[in-house]
Structure formats: structure tokens, C-alpha cells
A protein has these predicted regions:
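N-terminal Rossmann-like NAD(P)+-binding domain of SDR-like oxidoreductases, especially those catalyzing
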Residues: 1-185
Length: 185
């Protein structure tokens, strides 16, 4: 199945990160009339100046809109979905880092679990507010979900029932929430 991306509005979370900024740039430079709505909280876990330099380059594209905000803020996420009505959502935002999850677990619950829940809810309710559903949600998980599996390379069929970090547990939880939402809604 090939997605038609021309003339679509695509929401990319984590747009100031390496993958998010590269994806946004690729879409803006190769797809006709695509509009990218990029969200990032610009937290300082990674170098903020590096994130800002990526955004400077993306702002050169007239079809790029950047919104600074926290996905754990339900009203912020609701406003984004209401105002921009994206047809596609690429969720790359997350509080990253296995070791940091030992020091600041609240950040992982807030960003990774609550934030992703708000994205799922935004997708679910868009049809009511905009008259069209989100056509596709792409979620970026992490190889951390494979924990102590010794078999390489990893496979999607490998067991991932025993995460070894809170970060991995939040990423696996998000996979499960996305699966449940896809079946329920």
C-alpha cells in the first residue's frame, strides 16, 4: 500500500530531533504541496542549540509550521489537532535514554505515556472535529524493547515481555496502546 502524501497535512512530533528534522526536510523538499506541522518541546536532554539549528533550516520552507509544546499538555495537543486537522501523524517524540530513566522516571511517564495517549486521543477525535479521520499514525518505538534478548538480529516476533528499563517499558506500553486503539477505533 502506497500512501498519497501530496496535498496532505502531516503532524510530526519530535521534529527538532535528528530523525524528525530529516523526515520533515525530506517530505518538504520532495512532496508537492505537503504541509508539515512540527511539534517539539525542545527539552535539554539533547543539545538545544542543535535542535534550534535544525529548526532554522526547516523554517525556510513555507509549508512548515513549528509549534513548541509539551505533548503531556492535553489542551495543547487538542488545539493542534483542531487547528491543523492532520491527515497523517508521525510520532517520533519521546524522552529518550535508558540511564536517564533511572534518574528522572517522571519525565518518561509524562512524555512517553501521557504524551502518546494524548496523540492517540487527538487521532481518535479528529473525525468528530474535522470531519475526516487521521488516515495513518506512524509510531517510532525503540530497540530497547528487546531487553536482554540474545538473538541477533532482533525480529518483531521476538519476545519483549521483560523490559530492563523504564524507557523500554514506556516504548512497549505505547506499542500496546497503539494496537488497542487500532482495534477499538
Amino acid at each position: 500500500m502506497r500512501l498519497k502524501l501530496e496535498q496532505k497535512t502531516i503532524l510530526i512530533t519530535g521534529v527538532a530531533g535528528f530523525i524528525g528534522s530529516c523526515l520533515a526536510k525530506q517530505l518538504l523538499s520532495t512532496i508537492s504541496a505537503v504541509k508539515i506541522i512540527g511539534i517539539d518541546n525542545l527539552n535539554d536532554y539533547y543539545d538545544v542549540k542543535l535542535k534550534e539549528s535544525r529548526l532554522v533550516k526547516l523554517r525556510l520552507y513555507p509549508n512548515f509550521v513549528f509549534l513548541k509544546g509539551d505533548l503531556a499538555d492535553k489542551s495543547f495537543v487538542e488545539k493542534v489537532f483542531t487547528q491543523y486537522s492532520p491527515q497523517l501523524v508521525v510520532h517520533l517524540a519521546a524522552q529518550a535514554g535508558v540511564r536517564y530513566s533511572l534518574v528522572n522516571p517522571d519525565a518518561y511517564i509524562s512524555s512517553n505515556l501521557v504524551g502518546f495517549f494524548h496523540i492517540l486521543e487527538g487521532c481518535r477525535h479528529l473525525k468528530e472535529t474535522a470531519g475526516h479521520p487521521v488516515e495513518h499514525l506512524v509510531y517510532a518505538s525503540s530497540s530497547s524493547v528487546y531487553g536482554n534478548n540474545r538473538k541477533l538480529p532482533y525480529s518483531v516476533g521476538d519476545p519483549v515481555d521483560h523490559p530492563v528499563s523504564l524507557y523500554a517499558a514506556t516504548k512497549k506500553s505505547n506499542e500496546l496502546m497503539a494496537h488497542a486503539y487500532s482495534k477499538l477505533y
